Amino acid sequence: MSASNSGENPYTHVQFDTSVGTFVVELYYRHAPRTCCNMAALAESGYYDGTIFHRIIRDFMVQGGDPTGTGRGGESIYGGKFADEITRNLKHTGAGIVSMANSGPNTNGSQFFVTLKSTPFLDGKHTIFGRIYSGMGVVQRMGMTPTDDEDRPRSPITIHQARPFRGPPPPKPQQGAAALGAGQAHARITAS
C-alpha cells in the first residue's frame, strides 16, 4: 500500500485539479489520521479522477468525492464505511474547512465537502480533516455555480486529477491585500 498507510511520513496535502481551477487541501493528521489516510490513498489511486462535485449550496458548501455522482455512492480504503474522528478542538469556523460528508454517525466513505462560510451547526456531526491551503478563490467560484432544485450544478464541475504530496507545499500564489481576508478561515483549535 502507499506510504500514507505504511507508517512513513504521511502525505501532508492533496491537490485537486478541476475543470474550474486548482485548489490544495492541507490534511490534519494529528486530529483525524484515519480520515486523512483515506483521502490521501483514494487520491493516490486515482479514485477521485473524473468525479464531479455533485452538490453545491451557495453560501454553505461544495460536496464531491462520490464516483457515482449521485451523493449515494463511495467507499473508503477500509472497505465500506468507517468511524468518525470528531474532536471538539476543531470547529467549522469559516470558509475553507474540509470535512467528511456522511449519512449519520460513523458512515464516512469517500465523500467530502468544503465550507463556504462558518457552519457551527455541523460541529460534532462531521469529521474535520483539513482546510483549503491554496485556491480558495476556485472553491468560492464553485460555490457560485448555478444549480438545479436538487443542488446539482447545471454545468458539471469535474475533478480531472487529485494527487497527494508530502513536504512543503508549493508557494502560495501572490494575492492582493483585499484577497487575503476574503472569507478563508482556519479550523479553530482550542485547548481541552
Language-model features, listed with the residues they occupy:
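Cyclophilin-like peptidyl-prolyl cis-trans isomerases
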Residues: M1-S192
